[in-house]
Amino acid sequence: MPASAADLCEFINASPSPFHVCATVAGRLLDAGYAELSEVERWPDHPGRYFIVRAGSLVAWSAGQGVKAHAPFRIVGAHTDSPNLRVKQHPDLLVAGWRVVALQPYGGAWLNSWLDRDLGVSGRLSVRSAGKGSEITDRLVRIDDPILRVPQLAIHLAEDRKSLTLDPQRHVNAVWGVGDKAGSLLEYVAERTGVAVADVLAVDLMTHDLVPSMVIGADANLLSAPRLDNQVSCYAGMEALLASVPHDCLPVLALFDHEEVGSTSDRGARSNLLSTVLERIVLAAGGGRDDYLRRLPASLLVSADMAHATHPNYPECHEPSHLIEVNAGPVLKVHPNLRYATDGRTAAAFEVACQQAGVRLQRYEHRADRPCGSTIGPLASARTGIPTVDVGAAQLAMHSARELMGAHDVAVYSAALQAFFSADLF
């Protein structure tokens, strides 16, 4: 098994929610000597390696000695969230003797893939701190026991056996027991998390697949896991930042929540998160707003998100002249109507980075007769004015509860992003 693929499996297994992704990345950054800063406090005026966390988003950077106040940024951006089934605020139901938890889809979840799976619960609780008046703290939740399951209708009862139509309001609720009254999921979660249910003020809870991530295939060259979209890019960007070496440019890792639902939030790619952090980096180094503004057009951002490999059962769904393979290198994504932010200049820059890393680069275009998804790329580029290129690793079954990629792509994806941080591009 490739070492990087095994490490990615551990990363994904430890990160069932966006909050856990940030906690996992933060832990590895701290182990590497990074220091966490607060957005509401003054930042150090000396070089160093730092990061901030805003709920389910994280930004990290490495400012070495001698980096000029107007030196450009090299940014790898990715997203921490994945499509899933999320717990409603009043989830407890009793239906025909079944204790039911009401769920609803988050993002473009491929609903059929969540049926008949053993599911855990993860996320966070906002709780009243003991002995601290009205202060609120967050507690991460991770229950890996198989407490929930969304059962499929038996084929004998289906009106149409040739197709499957799921109503997101009625057909994706989970059973978790039987009885003569509804259970209390909140009481269960609070007890498992070690807090008093009376101290729980609010919840952000979601479900996750319990089958561990694993390398599969006769030649052990495929990786099966939940949340490949987009924890693979979070992992690869983190590894690239940790391996980055001092350079004239300042490397930044930006991991955003809420990409799967449009990025319009206090911590999404449409927010002020990245632009505020970048400007504060300049100000803390003794520069001014003019120095910050001078940096932006000379900077470069990689929007790192997963890409569609050509599906062997549905090759007709892909652009015939742009067939994408797994274990064949990262994927450059281009769209003439700017569903991706790539242009000729940014594509050339990433090509140079891949050449310096000795990594093959594939090129993807979407079929013109099918709607195309998007990424944080166009949003972050418009918000900051930084030239942007959209890239990713190839995978199958995007937005399913469980996805598939090439095990050898993990290392080359990280290597390409590491080269991007240090290559002379502009």
Curated annotation (Swiss-Prot):
This is Probable M18 family aminopeptidase 2. It holds the Pfam family Peptidase_M18. Transmembrane segments: none annotated. The keyword Zinc applies. GO terms for biological process: proteolysis. PANTHER family: ASPARTYL AMINOPEPTIDASE. One of its GO terms (molecular function) is metallopeptidase activity. Gene3D superfamilies: Aminopeptidase i, Domain 2, Zn peptidases. It comes from the Bacteria. Keywords: Aminopeptidase, Hydrolase, Metal-binding, Metalloprotease, Protease, Zinc. Its cofactor is Zn(2+). CDD domains: M18_DAP (cd05658). Belongs to the peptidase M18 family. InterPro entries: M18_aminopeptidase_2 (IPR022984), Peptidase_M18 (IPR001948), Peptidase_M18_dom2 (IPR023358). The lineage of its organism: Bacteria, Bacillati, Actinomycetota, Actinomycetes, Mycobacteriales. GO terms for cellular component: cytoplasm. Zn(2+) binds at H79, H156, H399. It comes from Mycobacterium leprae (strain TN). Its EC number is 3.4.11.-.
